[in-house]
Every structure is written in C-alpha cells, then in structure tokens.
Curated annotation (Swiss-Prot):
Source organism: Mus musculus
Lineage: Eukaryota, Metazoa, Chordata, Craniata, Vertebrata
Annotated GO MF terms: mRNA binding
Region span, Necessary for alternative splicing activity: 105-169
Name of the protein described by the UniProt record: Nuclear speckle splicing regulatory protein 1
Cross-link (Glycyl lysine isopeptide (Lys-Gly) (interchain with G-Cter in SUMO2)): K198, K209, K280
Subunit structure, as described in the record: Interacts (via C-terminus) with SRSF1. Interacts (via C-terminus) with SRSF2.
Disruption phenotype: Mice show early embryonic lethality shortly after implantation.
Family listed: Belongs to the NSRP1 family.
Amino acid sequence: MAIPGRQYGLILPKKTQPLHRVLQKPSVFGSDSDDDETSVSESLQREAAKKQAMKQTKLEIQKALAEDSTVYEYDSVYDEMQKKKEENNPKLLPGKDRKPKYIHNLLKAVEIRKKEQEKRMEKKIQREREMENGEFDDKEAFVTSAYKKKLEERAEEEEREKRAAALEAHLDVTKQKDLSGFYRHLLNQAVGEEAAPKSSFREARTVIKEEKLRGYPDETNSESRPPQQSCVLQRGAQEAEENPDADREFDDESSEDGEKRDHKVKSRGEDTGASMKHPKHHKNRAHSRSSSEERGLGTKHHSRGSQSRGHEHQDRQSRDQESCHKDRSHREEKSSHRHREASHKDHYWKKHEQEDKLKGREQEERQDREGKREKYSSREQERDRQRNDHDRYSEKEKKRKEKEEHTKARRERCEDSGKHREREKPEGHGQSSERHRDRRESSPRSRPKDDLDQERSSKARNTEKDKGEQGKPSHSETSLATKHRLAEERPEKGSEQERPPEAVSKFAKRSNEETVMSARDRYLARQMARINAKTYIEKEDD
C-alpha cells in the first residue's frame, strides 16, 4: 500500500486554471455614476505606479553611472570584441591584407626568363653584326637612356651572380677538405650571430649576404705580436689557402651599430687588396679601435678586463701551440699516408701492366705458332698433293706403256701364228673349220662353251707370254724386232690390199689376219685405243 501523500516518478507542475471573474449582475435600481468613480480611481493609481517606477529606474541608472561610466556603451564594447576575434582568427581578415602564396615565385621566374631571353637576343644581334663584317661601321648608332639603364642593371646582376657563385663555392661542403667552416656557421646560427639560410633557392640567389670579418678584443696588432704566435699565423695562412670558407663569417646588420658597419665597409672598399692578403691584420686594426673605445669606460673595468684578457691570452697561446703541434703531426701523417697510398697504387698499377704485357706476349707467341702451323700444314698438304699427283701420273704412264707393249706383242704373236697356220692347213680343212665355227656361232648352246674355251685359251696364252717375257730380252730390243717385222709385212699387205674387196657378210668367216681373240683381249684393245685418243689424263680415285 502506497502512502497517499507521496508521488513517485516524474512530477510535473499542474497548470493553474485562470480564475473566472464573477460578473455582478447589474441591478435594476443601480446608477452609472458609481462605475465612473471606480474607473477614475484605478487610472490614477496606474499613473502613480508608472511614475514611481520611472523614478526608481532613474535612480538605478544614476547609481550605475556613478559606479562605472562605461556601463551603457554597448556598441563600442561589441566593436572591440569583434576586432579581437578578427585578430585572433586570420581567416576573417579582409582580402586586402592577405598575401598570395605562389604568385610572387611565379613572377620571379618570369623575370628570370625575361632576362635570359634578353641575353639570347643580345647574343643573336652580336652574331649578326659579326656576319656583316663591318658593313655599317661608318653609320651612327643611337643608344637611348632606357637601353643604357638596362645595360647598367644587367652588369649589376652579373656581378651579383658572380658573388652568389663564389659564395656557393665557398659554402659547398664537397669542395672543402674539412668541416671547420661548416661547424663554425652552424655554431653562429645556433648562437644567433648569423641568420639561418632560407630553403628557397631563388630567394638565396636574389638575397645575397655581405661578407663581414669579425674581430676579437683580446687580439693586438700584427707588429706587436709575440714570436710565439708565428705558428698560429702560419696555420691560419695555410687554412686560408686550403679552405677559403674557414676564415669567412656572415653577420646580419643591426639597427644599433649600422653607422659603424657602413664606415667599416667604406674603409674596406679602399683597402681591398690588403684585406684579401692579410685578413687577420684587418681584424686586428678593427679590434684595436674597439679596445681603444672600451678603455674610456672606467679604470676598474679596464683593470678587470686586462686581467681577464691576460689569462685568456695565455690560454689561447697555449691552445694555439697545442693545435699547431697537432696540425703538424696530422699533416705529416696525412702526407705519409698519401705517399704510401700513391706508392701502393703505383706498385699495383705496375704489377697489372707487367701482367698485361706478359699476357699480350704469350697471346702473340701463341698466334705466331698457330699461324706457322697453319702455313706449314698448308704447304705440306700442297706438297703431298703434288707428290701424289706425280706418283699417280707416273703409275698411269707405266701402266699405259706396259699395256701398249703387251698388246703389240700379242698382235705380233697372233699374226705369226696365223701365217704359220695358213701355210700348214689345206684349204679344205679351212672350209670345214669355218663351217664348224659358223654352226657354233649359230647354235645358242654352244656359245657359252665357246666363251669358256676362249677364256681358258687366253689365260694360257697370258701365262705363256709372261714366261716368255721373262726369258726374252728387254723392251727396247723387242720393239726394234717388231719394227723390222712390220716393215717386212707392209709390202705383203699392200699386195693383198690391191686385190678387189669382196662383199663380206656380218656372220662370215674371218680371215687369218683378223684372228679371233678372246672377249677380254678385245676389251683391252678398245680401252687402249681410247686412252691413246685422249689428250688429257684422268685422275684415279683412291
């Protein structure tokens, strides 16, 4: 059971119902004058309340103004607030104050291109004048003031570019032997004596810093320098020769000492050669002036400064001596190391050259040997060919002569045997033999037997001839004998040829002069006839 007086959940206030005014019913016997009196009194009360409220507000305004006179300056306060907002937020600034991001770089690039184009045109005009070869030298050349100004500006720009190139060469770390100048500039930038270089290359080209020489108050003139500092001077001169950037420092001009620096620049312009040759002497003069100015400040400050300067001077002398000894030892080590490297390199290159020479000689010798071998082999091959050809030719000649002699001897024997048979055999017997031969030739069975008989007879004759040749005299004697026989037989043949020739058939019996020879003898005879008819010699295959 919940307690009746308490509520749970979201409690919302109830809307108060407007009170309905209870209208009095007008009485029949009432009069209108009573209503007029009530309305007048109410209006008077309202006016009195208004006047009282006005007086109250005036009093409050006076009190507030007495406390703070700027209480009711709303517009000025609002304007100040808006200005602060605009200052804090740069995006809300008007467009006139905003600067473009990229157009100034583009304009610089356009100017550079214009100047380059002008230089090109000048070179082109110069070439055209050279091509003319002085045709128009007698005529006047008009030069305007604007062109003169342009030439002056161009000369100034060329000087600036030369300075920028020299500055870049001095600041280039790759061209320096050590990093002393780089670390000195880095230290000056960290301390604040030198402004850090800008990243933009074009800004670095246009904005070129002037080179300033900084002096130290503890240094004295070069004439009054003690003999102990000669080592320091030598080291400084060597560093200036080796590293031109080591003794150069760049400082930004300040508003306080602007006049002094202008005076120094003028004096430097008068004595440029002396300052370039002896930069430390120039430093000493500048620092002697500064020390003379400082002397007039006070005796106490002077005494303290002189004591501190003396200590610093001694420390610096000791440091300079130590650094001089270190530099000497370092240079000696460097020179010895370089000498060793150079000797090592020379030895290495000499070794390589000797090896290359040896290799080249070996290659030449090999090539000569190979060439000689090739020549010798080619010559030997030619000689062998000539010998083989000569041997073959001689062998062929021998074979041919032997065959000729063999055939001649065979013919002679055949002729002798034929004559002897003609004498012995009668004519009848010759006719029967001829018939018998014709029958043999006509019958096909008897042909192979006849061939076999002929071959056997030819073989037997050959063997007899070989035996007879062994027992016979030499070829020259046989040739003479054969010549005599042929001479004797010629008249007999001539008498036989005088007789009228008879029609001889194809298969007729041959005469005794045309003796039958074997197939092999006929073949050899044909071959010999062909060989004798040829004017050249055939090469036989191996």
